[in-house]
């Protein structure tokens, strides 16, 4: 099962281009991020990266996974926003009054 944090890490790698830059932005170690990327490949059951001597890059499947992950994260944020707005409306008391008008 994939969690939202793994998807967030995948999209950060897509934005930053390197594991070290992405790990720095995420405030995690590079080996931790590398393990997450390996875990995602295992969960998906496909290769997401082209690995070089000291470099890792997305292959086409990896770019597609990152694109979809971005959409899922945005949708997750939208769900949070809607639920919070609903809760506020449910627990908001509206008081209306009418000020008396002068009679002269």
Features from the language model and the residues they span:
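Short alpha-helical "packing" element that flanks the helix-turn-helix/winged-helix DNA-binding module
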Residues: 6-13, 65
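Short helix-boundary/capping micro-motifs
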Residues: 11-29
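Residue cluster at the C-terminal edge of the helix-turn-helix DNA-binding motif
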Residues: 16, 25, 39-47
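Helix-turn-helix DNA-binding elements, focusing on the entry/boundary residues of the two helices
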Residues: 18-19, 37, 51
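A short LG(V/I)-centered, amphipathic sequence patch enriched
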Residues: 41-63
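Alpha-helical linker/hinge and terminal dimerization helices associated
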Residues: 43-44, 65-87
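N-terminal winged-helix
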Residues: 78-81, 88-104
């Amino acid at each position: 099962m994939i969690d939202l944090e793994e998807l967030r890490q995948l999209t950060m790698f897509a934005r930053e281009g390197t594991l070290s830059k992405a790990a720095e932005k995420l405030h995690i170690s590079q080996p931790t991020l590398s393990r997450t990327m390996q875990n995602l490949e295992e969960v998906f059951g496909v290769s997401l990266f082209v690995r070089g001597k000291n470099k890792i890059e997305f292959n086409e499947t990896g770019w597609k996974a990152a694109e979809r992950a971005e959409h899922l994260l945005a949708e997750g944020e939208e769900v949070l926003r809607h639920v919070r707005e609903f809760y506020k409306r449910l627990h908001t008391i509206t008081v209306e009054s009418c000020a008396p008008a002068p009679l002269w």
